[in-house]
Amino acid sequence: MVPLLIHLPPTSEDVNSSNRDERDLTEEVLSQAQVMYNIISSTATKGFKSKVYGQRHISFEIVAHGGLVHYYAVVPLVLVDVIRQAVAAAYPSARLEEVSDTNIFSKVGKMSGTIGGEFTLKKSFVYPISTYQESKRDASRALLNALSSASREDGIGVQFLLRPAYDGWSKASESHIDGMKKNKGKKKGFGGVAPMDIMEALWKPPENNEKDGGSSSEDKQLTSLEQAEVDAISEKARYPAYEVLVRVVISSNTAARSQVLLKNI
């Protein structure tokens, strides 16, 4: 793996914000990131080895060390040129420099002052996470504010480990949507029969099949909330997908200080 330090330009060099609507600026920033991720997704390979071991992964990292915040891309040697092209295509003013590994671990705190963890999804991966437009706030700014609380003796690393998702990931989303539509109105109990249906059958006269068939389409109408969920899943399936692991590691002089920094993140 090759560590690449990303030198970021002032925001005005890549995005001219003078006399422009904020929504247009947001769309431009998102489109730049989309260009980069589309190029990275093209590195996916096919074959037996890819199915067994998965795709090659890369890592984007935000590191706070020595009172400064740095951005890194750590990539396999064979993908260095591709990542350089992807970043240059999306952010022409950015520059990548090959550097040596950075050691963020405190010599004073050692193992006792080091703490870390990883983020996990609460629901299935078919559900989208809150995007930049939906959250109505700049998550990266909140993260930078947390990193800025680190002193020169502290070390913080936030790692986004990603690789292109397997080919059939979108089929899982389609199956989930189909299941929502088919199971609408079928909240059954034991044996596929609702308990209330059993009680009603004791005194309710039988109904013909035509009436049942006519009401089935009405039962399967999704509510506005369910339809919004379907739309969100379908929207996610339109874009290239990645398997992502987000990890955080913090090292400080004391365990208590590391805990405080972790809670800030």
Which role fits each region the language model picked out?
Residues 1-265:
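Extended, folded cores of ATP/NTP-driven motor/assembly subunits in large transport
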